[in-house]
Structures are given as structure tokens and as C-alpha cells.
Amino acid sequence: MSESTRLRIAIQKSGRLSKESQKLLKSCGVKFNVNEQRLIAHSDNMPIDLLRVRDDDIPGLVMDGVVDLGIIGENVLEEEQIERQSLGKPAECVKLRELDFGACRLSLAVPNEFEYQDASSLEGLRIATSYPNLLRRYMQEQGINYRDCMLKGSVEVAPRAGLSDGICDLVSTGATLEANGLYETEVIYRSMACIIQSTQSQPDDKQALINKILSRINGVVRAKESKYILLHAPTETLEQIVALLPGAENPTVLPLNDDTNRVAIHAVSTEDLFWDTMEQLTQLGASSILVMPIEKMMG
């Protein structure tokens, strides 16, 4: 591939999605070394360049066709799309799939002493946020008038600092809210990391590479969600045992040497095999039960 047809992928330079994005690409066989002083990392084994940028720059880079793919939180993507639509800028991209990391929620929160009934309790109050567009859309849907206080960070300190009456911010565990004397009242948006593609047409070789990377991502995500189960089972309870395996489709059943009354079962399960299920399997005569993670899947 020439320099102009190398695949360009934008990922977060630092922050909660940065390491997971790099880990995902490496799991897909993309080899690269990141120099913290440089914003571009070139793959050692594929015609791929990684651009390490601010997360809120990623949607625009994809929508403007500067990069081909981006890994970004859905909250940032939606916020930027609303902003660009209001300004008449290109706001289209293709969401290829959600990923299995970066889960969070955008929530309203108020001080512990605030007597909150419902969203109308915020009528006329000042709300601090880094997501003014998502907040505005929600409040308009609820028919609530409010005043916004735009902050780029440390939103949770705004009420204590006298800047706002409440906040609208990302929440993962709620520990940060609790530490700042706040409690969550409404979830206005749920978000995961996702991979997006530019709507610009691609040369055949570049699109083929995009398809290959997406296929590998699908395999990596499926593998994380699955377990490989091996066990020995009596033939007389075989149907009951197979029925207990969560999410298993068409398990492989093999005869055991010198034992016509027992078989070996191999299965891929897309759900967790909990201890109580394993105990039920044991009660049905299953033995040598192994539950193992899967590194990669395809097909």
C-alpha cells in the first residue's frame, strides 16, 4: 500500500479508553509500539497508522475523512454529532459495532441535601456539565428550563464551588459522586466504546483491510464473551447435562477409551458457567469439569 492508502485509525491519546483500544488492536494482530512523545504510531506488520488524539477530536476526524476508523465512546460521538449538525458541518459516520469496554452512563446528580422528586425538581436551576448537547436534548424532551454551566473537567466539584445547583456527568461506579457529596438522580444516556468508519468511499485494498480488522475484532469480542467447557458425562444423563450448559450450541460428544458408559463433552458457551450449574452437573454424574477462557474465535 502507498502512504495515501494506509489505514488510519484514531484512538484516545490518554484516558479511560486508551489502553483498552491499544489492547484490542494488539489482540487483532496489529503490532505497534507507542512512543508517548509522538502522536502517530506505525504498525510493524500491517499498513496501519494509529493517531493518538483527544477523544473529542476523534468523531470530527472520522466525519471529515481525515482518518478512516475511530474508537470512541458513544457519549462523545453523540455529543459531537449534535454539535456539528447545529453548525451545518458533516456529522455522518458508520458505527461498525459496539465494543466490550468503556461502559458508563451520563447522569444527573445533585447534592445530598437536595430534595429531588423528579426531573422537574431541576426547573430553573443551573447544571454543570461537559456534555451540553446531550443535556439540552434530554431537558427539552422533559420540558424543563434550566441554565447550563459548561466545564471541561472536574464537573463534580461545581456545586461545592457554588458554580451550579447540580451536575450532568459520566458515572461508572458512583464513587466520585459520593466523595463529593452528590447522589445520582437520573440516567440520561448509556454509553459503550464503539468503532466508527468514515462514510467516504475507500479503495478496494483499504476496504478489504477494514473488513479484516472488523472480522478480527468480532472474533476477539466473541472470545471474551465465551468459555470453552470440557467434561466427562454418563451416557444415561447426557441430555440433561447438555441442557444445563448455558448458551451452548451443538456440543461435541466423543467416546472415552475403554468406557462405553461415559463420553467426553466439548462445548463453547456464550454465558458464564456459575458454581451452582457446575454443582448440578456434578450431581448428574459429570466429572473432570474444565471451564477455560478463549483467546480468539473465528467462523
Swiss-Prot record:
One biological process term from GO is:
L-histidine biosynthetic process
Q: In which pathway does it act?
A: Amino-acid biosynthesis; L-histidine biosynthesis; L-histidine from 5-phospho-alpha-D-ribose 1-diphosphate: step 1/9
UniProt activity-regulation remark? Feedback inhibited by histidine.
User: Keywords, A to Z?
Assistant: Amino-acid biosynthesis, ATP-binding, Cytoplasm, Glycosyltransferase, Histidine biosynthesis, Magnesium, Metal-binding, Nucleotide-binding, Transferase
Record flagged with keyword Cell membrane: no
Gene Ontology CC annotation, any one: cytoplasm
Localization recorded for this chain is: Cytoplasm
Key word Metal-binding present: yes
Its recorded reaction(s) are: 1-(5-phospho-beta-D-ribosyl)-ATP + diphosphate = 5-phospho-alpha-D-ribose 1-diphosphate + ATP
Q: Which InterPro entries match?
A: ATP-PRT_HisG_long, ATP_PRibTrfase_cat, ATP_PRibTrfase_CS, ATP_PRibTrfase_HisG, HisG_C, N-reg_PII-like_a/b, N-reg_PII/ATP_PRibTrfase_C
Name the cofactor(s).
Mg(2+)
Chief location bin: cytoplasm
The protein's enzyme class: transferase
Q: Which Enzyme Commission number(s) are on file for it?
A: 2.4.2.17
Q: Which GO terms describe its molecular function?
A: ATP binding; ATP phosphoribosyltransferase activity; magnesium ion binding
What Pfam families does the record tag this protein with? HisG, HisG_C
Q: Which CDD domains match?
A: PBP2_HisGL2
Q: Which family does it belong to?
A: Belongs to the ATP phosphoribosyltransferase family. Long subfamily.
Q: What does this protein do?
A: Catalyzes the condensation of ATP and 5-phosphoribose 1-diphosphate to form N'-(5'-phosphoribosyl)-ATP (PR-ATP). Has a crucial role in the pathway because the rate of histidine biosynthesis seems to be controlled primarily by regulation of HisG enzymatic activity.
- What name does the UniProt record give this protein? ATP phosphoribosyltransferase
Protein's organism: Shewanella pealeana (strain ATCC 700345 / ANG-SQ1)
Instruction: Tell me the gene name.
Output: hisG
